[in-house]
């Protein structure tokens, strides 16, 4: 069981990383809430991990905190929610927001996540309610909100060319597709979130937040 990984960040794409650990490259899938906290390529990265073994694949999922890892592990225990859907949930909302949804039985907000309908949202609340409330102190102890990396801060000061804007848009759409959104919805979400954004991470963050607010 691989429970933690520390190494050099070789590649980073929304939802998937390549980390060099003593010459061995590990592909690690991450929620966007973890992706936002990453440093630049060639920087050191440390993640808590959960290893999933299936008949057709072995996949490693990484999280910025032990709490997020625990929440993920509880989510995938819910009938009808696999690892991909759990990652989509933790991409659209942090652990605190998820806890609020569970406490308030906000089925409509949970149903904004791709792959989750009303029935699945209701089942999620029933099955995870007590477990998540027991973790409330750990969840609230985490720093609220997402972290803006120095790379994002520097990029926000730079002008965006048409070519760069197209690249950011396409990368954002690909990330939203990977999270389970349909092509038409992904393009609409990315387009509405573009504004003066200068990184794909910024667009994706705004798109996911916008999706939650519009249906919350």
Swiss-Prot record:
UniProt xrefs under InterPro entries: DNA_helicase_Holl-junc_RuvA_I, Hlx-hairpin-Hlx_DNA-bd_motif, NA-bd_OB-fold, RuvA, RuvA_2-like, RuvA_C, RuvA_C_sf
Region Domain I: start-end pairs: 1-64
Disulfide pairings: none
Region: Domain III, residue numbers: 164-216
Alphabetical list of CDD domains matching this protein: UBA_RuvA_C
Stretch list, region Domain II: 65-143
Pfam assignment, any one: RuvA_N
Entry note about domains: Has three domains with a flexible linker between the domains II and III and assumes an 'L' shape. Domain III is highly mobile and contacts RuvB.
Record function comment: The RuvA-RuvB-RuvC complex processes Holliday junction (HJ) DNA during genetic recombination and DNA repair, while the RuvA-RuvB complex plays an important role in the rescue of blocked DNA replication forks via replication fork reversal (RFR). RuvA specifically binds to HJ cruciform DNA, conferring on it an open structure. The RuvB hexamer acts as an ATP-dependent pump, pulling dsDNA into and through the RuvAB complex. HJ branch migration allows RuvC to scan DNA until it finds its consensus sequence, where it cleaves and resolves the cruciform DNA.
Protein name (record): Holliday junction branch migration complex subunit RuvA
Organism from which the protein derives: Francisella tularensis subsp. holarctica (strain LVS)
Origin organism lineage: Bacteria, Pseudomonadati, Pseudomonadota, Gammaproteobacteria, Thiotrichales
């Amino acid at each position: 069981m691989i429970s933690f990984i520390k190494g050099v960040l070789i590649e980073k794409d929304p939802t998937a990383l390549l980390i060099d650990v003593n010459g061995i490259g590990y592909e690690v899938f991450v929620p966007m809430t973890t992706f936002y906290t990453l440093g630049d390529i060639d920087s050191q990265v440390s993640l808590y991990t959960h290893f999933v073994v299936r008949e057709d694949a072995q996949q490693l999922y990484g999280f910025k905190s032990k709490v997020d890892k625990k929440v993920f592990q509880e989510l995938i225990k819910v009938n009808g929610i696999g690892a991909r859907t759990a990652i989509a949930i933790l991409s659209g909302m942090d652990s605190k927001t998820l806890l609020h949804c569970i406490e308030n039985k906000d089925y409509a907000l949970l149903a904004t996540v791709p792959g989750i309908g009303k029935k699945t949202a209701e089942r999620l609340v029933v099955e995870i309610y007590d477990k998540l409330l027991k973790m409330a102190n750990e969840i609230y102890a985490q720093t609220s909100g997402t972290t803006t990396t120095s790379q994002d801060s520097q990029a926000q000061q730079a002008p965006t060319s048409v070519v760069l804007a197209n690249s950011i848009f396409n990368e954002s759409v690909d990330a939203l597709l990977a999270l389970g959104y349909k092509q038409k919805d992904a393009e609409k979400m990315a387009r509405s979130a573009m504004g003066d954004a200068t990184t794909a991470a910024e667009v994706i963050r705004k798109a996911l937040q916008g999706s939650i607010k519009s249906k919350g």
